[in-house]
Amino acid sequence: AYTAVAAAMIGLQYRYREILCTSVSNTVVLIMLYLQIQNPVVFLDTTTGIGNGTAFESQLEDRLRRKGEGYVLTIHLSKFYHIHTILGTENSNELLREIGEYLYDLCGKFHVFHTAGDAFTVFADTKEQCERLKCEIQKRFESDWVVQENRIALDMETVVQHYPTDFKAMAEYYGMREFLLENAGKSGAQVIVEADADMIAQYRRRRKVEIAVARAIREKGFLVYYQPV
């Protein structure tokens, strides 16, 4: 926001030379640019050093706005909070950094984010890249992670969503993701669940029921229509 306003003011003065910004205005522009440069933490996860949930949402919204296509992979660390209790905060944070560095090296800049305490999210731009990442990530999690000479076996579930086939808006992305993670959690360790037509239909049916129930609660009742066969 700071950069956008500052750029607009500079552009205005360049385009319309008769409009001169005062010294106070110029100072404000410089302050806004300085704050933007000095505040990268807004988009960085302080634990892992990679992009955070805010950065991910900004990227995904931009991708959806440009009407492109691609894949979003969510890697959920099963039972991470139980492991956190055993290892303690410092070692758990080191474990997250190890995972973040691995995914960053594998996926590249602007493609991996630490979006929750027990979850990382990755962008894949093509089907081929998505398939490669699925295989590489699953293979890596089959081996232990080493933190302070402790060997840690981590279970994970990976869910894969394609846009715009599976979702076209942020709310739909989050709803579908939770539905897929719920299904993945029933399937055991190191599982990969990819949205397909059947799963999408199941999710949308359940979503309609949830909306109907919420409306019934709000309106304190609902109508039932019976059509004899």
Describe each PLM feature range.
Residues 1-43:
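Interfacial "cap-and-anchor" motif at the non-cytosolic start of specific transmembrane alpha-helices
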Residues 24, 52, 92, 130, ...:
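The cytosolic transmitter module of two-component sensor histidine kinases
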Residues 40-52:
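A cytosolic-side transmembrane-helix exit/cap motif
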Residues 49-71, 78-104, 113-117, 127-135, ...:
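Conserved long alpha-helical elements within nucleotide-processing catalytic cores of c-di-GMP signaling
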Residues 56, 120, 223:
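Hydrophobic scaffolding residues in well-structured cytosolic catalytic/regulatory domains
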Residues 73-77, 160-162:
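Short hydrophobic alpha-helical segments used for membrane anchoring or interfacial signaling
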Residues 113-123, 140, 144-182, 187-196:
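A short glycine-enriched loop-to-beta-strand structural element that forms part of the catalytic core
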Residues 205-229:
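Active-site core of bacterial EAL-family cyclic-dinucleotide phosphodiesterase domains
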